[in-house]
Amino acid sequence: MDGLRASAGLLRRGRLRRRRQQQPHSGSVLALPLRPRKIRRQLRRSVSSRMAALRAQTLQSEDSEDSRVESTVGEPGDPLAGGTAALSDATGREPHGQLGPVELLEASPASRSLQTPRALVEAQTPAARLVEAQTPAARLVEAHTPAARLVEAHTPPARLVEASALPARLVETSALLCSTQHLAAVPPSVAPAMLSGPQGESTGEELPWDSPLQRILAELNRIPSSRRRAARLFEWLISPMPPDHFYRRLWEREAVLVRRQDHSYYQGLFSTAVLDSILRNEEVQFGQHLDAARYINGRRETLNPPGRALPAAAWSLYRAGCSLRLLCPQAFSTTVWQFLAVLQEQFGSMAGSNVYLTPPNSQGFAPHYDDIEAFVLQLEGRKLWRVYRPRVPTEELALTSSPNFSQDDLGEPVLQTVLEPGDLLYFPRGFIHQAECQDGVHSLHLTLSTFQRNTWGDFLEAVLPLAVQAAMEENVEFRRGLPRDFMDYMGAQHSDSKDPRRTAFMEKVRVLVARLGHFAPVDAVADQRAKDFIHDSLPPVLTDRERALSVYGLPIRWEAGEPVNVGAQLTTETEVHMLQDGIARLVGEGGHLFLYYTVENSRVYHLEEPKCLEIYPQQADAMELLLRSYPEFVRVGDLPCDTVEDQLSLATMLYDKGLLLTKMPLT
């Protein structure tokens, strides 16, 4: 496979060279084992035994726990976080092929506090459970907040059913507050920044110090494990719903609405003032970074002039009724970058975003569905949303986005609601949606997207051609010739034939297809998809600890005409682990091993070519140990290499590239 062969684009002995752009999947290289099978088994046993010995020598770290967040709800009907009760469902968990109802959560003031399993204080107000019949099979779950407000969808009156529930729980947050540093705006391709609070982006706006977003970013800065940071941020994003409940019951199945009654929940993430600053200070181009569109009389119009989107042009289009869509705001906003860079590890798939600003009394886009899982974060103003189920089974979990629909193409919405600041709306791929501003109020929202073409079908699409190729090489049954007369009974014109030869032919195909699983290079294709994810990923954002203990925090500087504090070196006694969990992947290509990494990625999608280091065979087991032992520390002298030189060479190369951190600062 030409695009994956070892060539001059590799990194050799620490020298960085660009690799050519990868080619589409082809045959033999991905199926090649890195070593003979028996040796690989022995090496894996060796690595496993070393890891077991390492764990026996050290105390169990809290970061080594499974990254999944423990749910506060067991089975349906148990109380959710914040006193919200989940509506019981006698049918149990829905299979993937069926779509359940819409779920709505009303976040109480208690649940709006920063949540933690510690320091729980019982509140006085009992929770309530409501069932609303605004659409067929629609389900609305509401907490005890007296200010709750539901938008009716011109249907029969809702039925309200009182239900007893456990008392709401209040979370003590004072212990989680800590000071953070604000980052200055940075260019799209730089060294990783520190995780900190919301950024003003040079707009001069006053950001609230004690906002929910500020508090969660401060909390993340204190969590040493990147996988736990990702889990915690996602828990905050969908709070008060437990992540376990969301993934088991709702992910890829149902639309979800979370009401928080807290307009400050996302404050500091993005704003119209930040957008104005970006238009003034950045090279924003119409069509590439910014779209201007409007939906009038059942038709969508895109009114992008050529060239740069200067404030005069952009705001004139806005005044003319156009919605402004900022593509890839993470390239311009440090806070959005921080937000997505942490969350991408939760999804195991690229996390992207767009920002939409819609003027009052207007609609920017026609009804349509997308090919991504969408999380809508309402930042400013209000917007009326209508969400519809997939019309036919082929649209469920759609693989591609739809064309624009007319109103006549739509049925009754499964959800109709007005989003206000702090609210969250989730809907799966294939759910049709449209949104409009009313009542003289503008709207600003950010859509977080993920899971584009990340399906079993996409995986098998890469596996099966390689499996057929391997089967033909290794099994003579796949090389036997077709019957000379097969065209006499096979094909569409013979589809109704009862010829026994046709039955035998179909049975032979089924037998051969069943045997393909034995030849499928599943691990090799998984590595290739992981490599693609590494290239798709945003560069990591570092905590204060990660920066201080990595090459990014070394005190080397220019002073008095010469560099000072040069010479810090790793030794065999230095304890190290990977900088973060998802920043690197070891991949076999063309009989060689390469470590692909994210720390030099750009905030602009695929602006940089994939970056990698070549790992030599004598260092392969040590590299695997480092990748698999995170977040536990490993002594450089305990790395499974034949020589001390190989141990120090590997550790130094990784440290100098910003891929390792040390237990103690180097001096």
From Swiss-Prot:
EC number: 1.14.11.27, 1.14.11.79
Positions of the JmjC domain: 322-467
Location within or outside the cell: Nucleus, Nucleolus; Nucleus, Nucleoplasm
Catalytic EC class: oxidoreductase
Pfam families given in the database record: JmjC_2, RIOX1_C_WH
Region annotation Disordered: where it falls in the sequence: 1-99
Keyword Repressor: yes
Cofactor: Fe(2+)
Molecular function GO labels: 2-oxoglutarate-dependent dioxygenase activity; histone H3K36 demethylase activity; histone H3K36me/H3K36me2 demethylase activity; histone H3K4 demethylase activity; histone H3K4me/H3K4me2/H3K4me3 demethylase activity; iron ion binding; peptidyl-histidine dioxygenase activity; protein demethylase activity
Cellular component terms per the entry's GO annotation: nucleolus; nucleoplasm; nucleus
SUPFAM superfamilies: Clavaminate synthase-like
Catalytic activity: N(6),N(6)-dimethyl-L-lysyl(36)-[histone H3] + 2 2-oxoglutarate + 2 O2 = L-lysyl(36)-[histone H3] + 2 formaldehyde + 2 succinate + 2 CO2; N(6)-methyl-L-lysyl-[protein] + 2-oxoglutarate + O2 = L-lysyl-[protein] + formaldehyde + succinate + CO2; L-histidyl-[protein] + 2-oxoglutarate + O2 = (3S)-3-hydroxy-L-histidyl-[protein] + succinate + CO2
Modification Phosphoserine occurs at: 61, 64, 108
Residue ranges with Low complexity bias: 1-11
Sites of N-acetylmethionine modification: 1
Record field: compositional bias (Basic residues): 12-22, 35-44
Residues given in the record as Fe cation binding sites: 368, 370, 433
Family: Belongs to the ROX family. NO66 subfamily.
Matches recorded under PANTHER family: MINA53 MYC INDUCED NUCLEAR ANTIGEN, RIBOSOMAL OXYGENASE 1
Subunit annotation: Interacts with SP7/OSX; the interaction is direct. Interacts with MYC. Interacts with PHF19; leading to its recruitment to H3K36me3 sites.
The protein's name: Ribosomal oxygenase 1
